[in-house]
Amino acid sequence: MVEVVFMQAKRLAVFILVLLLVQIVHAKLSDIFPTPQTLILGTESFPLESFSLMWKVDADLKDKFQFSIIESEDAVRKISVTIGETVELSHYGNEAYLIEVTDEGGRIVAISERALYYALITFKQLIKDAVELPEVTIIDAPDYQIRGVIEGFYHDPWSHAARVDMVRFLGESKMNTYVYAPKDDPYHREKWREPYPDEKLAQLKELVQAAKASYVDFVFAISPGLSIEFSSESDWQKLLAKTDAMIEIGITHFALLLDDIDPNLRSARDRAKYGNDYALAQVDLCNRYQDYLAAKIPGHRLIVVPTEYYQEGTSPYRRTYNTKLSPDIIVYSTGYGIVAQTITPKEAREIYEIWGHDIVYWDNYPVNDYNRTKLFMAPIAGRGPTLPGTLGFTFNPMNEAELSKLPLLTCADYTWNSASYVPEHSWERAVAILGGEHQDTYRRFAEHNLVFFPDGPQQEYPTLTKLAQEFLTAHKAYAEARKSSADAPIDDELKDDTLAKLKALQDEFRALEGLRGEFEEYFPLAAKEAAPYLKRLENWGKVGAYYTDTLLKILEAGPLSSSTVTPEMLSTYSTALETYLKGLALNRFDVLSSSQIGSSTVVLPILDSLGRVFASNFTAETIVASTNMPVWQNYVPANAVDSDTGTFFWSSRGQRPGDFFMVDLGSVQTLSGISLLMGNSNLDYFHKCIVEISADGTLWEAVATLEGTPDHIIQFSEPKTARYLKVTGLVEKEYWIIIRQFEPIYTEKKTAFGYDRTMVDVFNKIAVDPLFVIESEITVSLEVPVPIETAGIIQDPSLPTTWTLSYSLDGETFIEGAVLDSLVQVLPLPPDPIKAL
């Protein structure tokens, strides 16, 4: 845990200077990454140019670490640089260091060469862009001995250049381990018996040298479990030959991986020798291999991944490992589960006791090989401080090496100082490090790919979600006041607030629209890996910009109704509709139809809500559906209230008591019943639930308790009035929830602006559901003839068709009008009042 101590000021006269210094030093503290264990701040500062380093190390090492920044011969303050013991570091390991800056000079003391490398990284951070050095003492060392990555994912492995860059990055981040274990390297796994080709071997040698230069231990992992015969002398010799070849190119650390294999012994000789006990066969191989390596490399400790690497509790297999595996061997575990949601001190203690050996965690974060449509760029979370029985962590990164650096920086921070680790703070500092002067651009991309774990907390699109919610809340208040109050000042104030929040949301959508160009310019390597995600965000930005442009136009024009309509207002609404249709077309044919890169579970509901706000300005009431259940992909709540049982809402987890689905009819209506249709030829429906209605959303009346079947038509014995409908689950089941329809059965439907319910439904389908398709023809009838200035249509670009727009003045005789032959087209209509289209 970081300890910050302030020394007492020496002179009262410099009180203001002391306060200023504290602010400066706090800024410098935030630059030191990972978070140091102890930092003691003084009250003075000194000109940087007054310092120089006195190197008390070997000349070769001095040349390797030379600082040209503070090497003035005229410097009056000397900072000695040494490798050795000091009383302040006596309780720390061999990566500990001390930095002390005083009025007389100072010292940098490191326990080892690697520790000196880390000390100088910290010192560089301390003097970066500085003109003065603060009076400070830093005592620092990592919590865990092993800190790094394991390239252990499936699918496309990293390039050689990416690996070389990664080991440099690890060293600069004070991580010390790189485990080479790419599942798609055949010479590591399927062809483990065969030697590496010369070209590949040369690349490995270069990578080993790069790791050594950055004080990173290169661990070569071999994975023979798919085909090895444990009792075969030939296979044993091939394993040793492969190992010797790796030692010859400078590798001194090894791991034996027995994960993701058939646990059964395949050969008759193995079954005869080991009594069909595959744990015994594995342990025998591991112990022999450890003995061989220890003889070749004194002090070597083999790391082993057992076949049962993630299960809870013990088993005969794990008991064999516990009692018969060499105590010098380190056991790899992923924690409880292949992708562990948490690793707490209690869980770590249990895992250590299960195996009876030192544990290193193969942490499957931020790996995304199991979900290639996601980037896991959130900070590491759910790992407890200083876990018992734990030597360290190696984190399995994403296939995207450059984009992995953000979460990996937070992993470096956690493994260095776990007690002081705060995920959100660490993430912000990592963004600043990687983003530099363009960190706003980097942050905008990263925060739109914030995913912790597949079953854990999702925090994607936090800014967009916040801005959208603020606008929707403001608009709801404005719309309610507009209906119920004639107090113009209040209305104007609410309108101004709504417009301000809408403009803020529009700015964010426009920023997303331009993000790809900025990211490609500032971060070209990351942009190559992020290309499909950047395109997706650009599309979201374009759609959102269209929608917010539309809403700004109509909100500034004012509500459209039969009593307020003017030619100018109709013209504004016509332009707004055209803009909206462009966004809708992009959403339907470019965003939804594209590869499901990135998440649509957040943005689609936002766009759906914006579409409903748009629709609400054309119709007095719009049915709005909501839920407290997470949404699966684009199966949004609106699908359950679109009068189309072919579309549906779908949750993304099993049902729990208290899960609800609610419908707001927009105003109090008179109902004769409710239609609740769930499921879709499966068990995804509320297996027991209660249906309630309410006029105000506060007082609820239960109208039915349902169970056993997915479809229900609830008929009231006498008409009831309600604005809200709600169905709430009462039991816990593994099945998700599908709702195809949850709609009222009206006794009498109130209408506004001359539209009958057919028009409302058709409009809402088009506005809310981009998948609504007209098969051959559609007729829209109005309750009374009204002037219609324009009509719009969107077509699927993969199935373009020529349409004829016909109109009727009496609802019976149709007159052929314009031909619709473009993908997005808005056409004028004659000035006569129209009854049907």
Model segments located where?
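Substrate-binding cleft of carbohydrate-active enzyme catalytic domains
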Residues: V149, D156-H300
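C-terminal functional modules
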Residues: V422-F618
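Bacterial N-terminal signal peptides that target proteins for export
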Residues: V5-A13
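Catalytic-core regions of glycoside hydrolase
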Residues: S112, F153, E190, E194, ...
